[in-house]
Amino acid sequence: MSLLTEVETYVLSIVPSGPLKAEIAQRLEDVFAGKNTDLEALMEWLKTRPILSPLTKGILGFVFTLTVPSERGLQRRRFVQNALNGNGDPNNMDRAVKLYKKLKREITFHGAKEVALSYSTGALASCMGLIYNRMGTVTTEVAFGLVCATCEQIADSQHRSHRQMVTTTNPLIRHENRMVLASTTAKAMEQMAGSSEQAAEAMEVASQARQMVHAMRTIGTHPSSSAGLKDDLLENLQAYQKRMGVQMQRFK
């Protein structure tokens, strides 16, 4: 796996799924391929994106700044600086300075990532802030190691919280989760459908599922009533894909 592929993988792992994630993936690919060289426009676009947390925007802004060639005097962006200040906690800043000194001695991406993984997310963000604000310089490889370590920590905590939700025994949360998943699956079916005869069938199934979820939410139903709803939908989606000769395992 190339360095940039690895960076893209880690950064995208902390972006919530949805159309915006696809857009960000495209922007990252363009930047890494040298196709997008207007850093100013890129940062303006990033600043106005909804849904993303300030820290995620800060990390993306840091990656764009590292990758896109720009004039030396280009102004640093406030939204990135604010996100990478370690919540203003002096402890984070102290640890960030210690980490920075260690990173200065590293020359490889993996070496930097290993060193960084033993620090808290706040300290890692502060260290990125130091580099972003030109208070310190490290090689691009080392900076990317720092980025990936930060993303790994964030993704780990997101995964833990996701696992807690999936394994919860609270029937109301499980019920709502099934309905949300059914809705997003229906949306995916509608987006994939296109305009063939089978597509009309897929649209019909998706539409019925959405109406059902809407009705369940409106009138309130027993928490077990949604069991199997997403599975039925996925079964329909896979049958439709088979007929269309499409194999999309990623919906599982």
From Swiss-Prot:
Annotated spans, Membrane-binding: 1-164
InterPro entries referenced in this protein's UniProt entry, alphabetically: Flu_matrix_M1, Flu_matrix_M1_C, Flu_matrix_M1_N, Flu_matrix_M1_N_sub1, Flu_matrix_M1_N_sub2, INFV_M1
Residues covered by region (RNP-binding): 165-252
Motif Nuclear localization signal mapped to chain: 101-105
SMART domains linked: Flu_M1_C
GO cellular component, one term: membrane
One Pfam entry name: Flu_M1
Keywords, in A-Z order: Host nucleus, Membrane, RNA-binding, Viral matrix protein, Virion
Membrane topology: Peripheral membrane protein
Subcellular location: Virion membrane; Host nucleus
Subunit structure and binding partners: Homodimer and homomultimer. Interacts with NEP. Binds ribonucleocapsid by both interacting with genomic RNA and NP protein. May interact with HA and NA. Cannot bind NP without genomic RNA.
Name recorded for this polypeptide: Matrix protein 1
Species of origin: Influenza A virus (strain A/Turkey/Ireland/1378/1983 H5N8)
